[in-house]
Design a protein with these regions (language model features):
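Catalytic pocket of metal/acid-base enzymes, prominently hydrolases
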Residues: 2-129, 150-203
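Hydrophobic/aromatic residues located in beta-strands of well-ordered beta-sheets
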Residues: 17, 127, 209, 241-243
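Acidic-and-aromatic substrate-binding clefts and catalytic sites of carbohydrate-active enzymes
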Residues: 104-110, 134-136, 217-219
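Distinct, well-ordered alpha-helical segments
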Residues: 112-116, 139-145, 219-232
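Short helix-capping segments at alpha-helix termini
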Residues: 119-124, 149, 229-238
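Hydrophobic, small-residue-rich alpha-helical packing segments that form membrane-like cores
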Residues: 135-140, 156
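Glycine-rich phosphate/ribose-binding loops and adjacent secondary-structure elements
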Residues: 200, 206-208, 223-228
């Protein structure tokens, strides 16, 4: 089972702590972190996410859009620490012969960090980035010469959207219930209208669109959005959608 706030409180009773599942789709906050973020039993849950509760009290566990929403409010590490960690990770990838890497979810908060990496010449590997709507908009403004082409080892490749979660966390959106479940099939993180709007946006800007869709219900939602957009005249070949 997942740990909860009580588990983390025993390890860190005073300091705010958040741990992330290896999939990136869920995580746990301790009591100090929940208090710092203002999360209570009355906190509204973002659509397409889960704030775990027990008897009306947050357990610290969150999934999908809920976890992503509160995770991005956690303060970033100091810039120098980030740059040092990035250089070490880059060297590790290069040691295995990897020369191109992907930033699979470029959020707006990460754009200043990439500006710093480019400013001091830290990028040695080619990085292709795919952002959510806000992240891609910010990156287009910050790196106009890097849209769809490499400039100083950085390229803004297009958009990324998430239509469901992860199978290992049992949040991937399925057509049939999970094993051992009567009805639970996971859930989608976007409405049909939101998915279609993102396809239209990528098509209008001739930007590639990468869609995270693990479950077959999420895959069907993405295909339906692409089919609708194609009927409306969106040039899918030009945007090169990826599932």
């Amino acid at each position: 089972r997942h740990p909860d706030r009580a588990c983390l409180d025993r390890a860190a009773p005073e300091n705010p702590v958040v741990i992330c599942h290896q999939s990136g789709h869920m995580g746990v906050f301790n009591t100090a972190a929940l208090e710092r973020l203002g999360v209570t039993g009355d906190t509204p849950c973002p659509a397409g996410g889960v704030i775990g509760q027990e008897n009306g009290v947050p357990t610290g566990y969150m999934e999908e859009n809920a976890f992503l929403e509160f995770q991005k409010r956690v303060p970033m590490m100091p810039l120098e620490a980030f740059l040092g960690a990035y250089r070490k990770a880059q060297d590790l990838y290069a040691s295995y012969g990897i020369t191109t890497v992907q930033e699979g979810l470029l959020r707006r908060e990460l754009v200043p960090l990439y500006q710093a990496l480019l400013a001091d010449g830290s990028l040695k590997l080619d990085v292709v980035a795919y952002g959510d709507e806000a992240g891609t908009t910010a990156a287009r403004q910050a790196f106009p010469a890097s849209v769809r082409q490499y400039q100083e080892h950085f390229k803004l490749g297009g958009y990324k959207m998430f239509l469901d979660g992860s199978p290992q966390g049992r949040t991937a959106w399925l057509r049939q219930p999970y094993a051992g479940e009567a009805e639970y099939r996971g859930y989608g993180t976007l409405t049909d209208a939101q998915a279609l709007d993102m396809v239209r946006r990528a098509g209008a800007e001739r930007m590639q669109l990468l869609a995270h869709c693990n479950g077959d219900a999420a895959c069907a939602q993405y295909l339906a959005a692409l089919e609708t957009a194609a009927r409306e005249g969106v040039d899918l070949a030009a945007m090169r959608p990826v599932m």
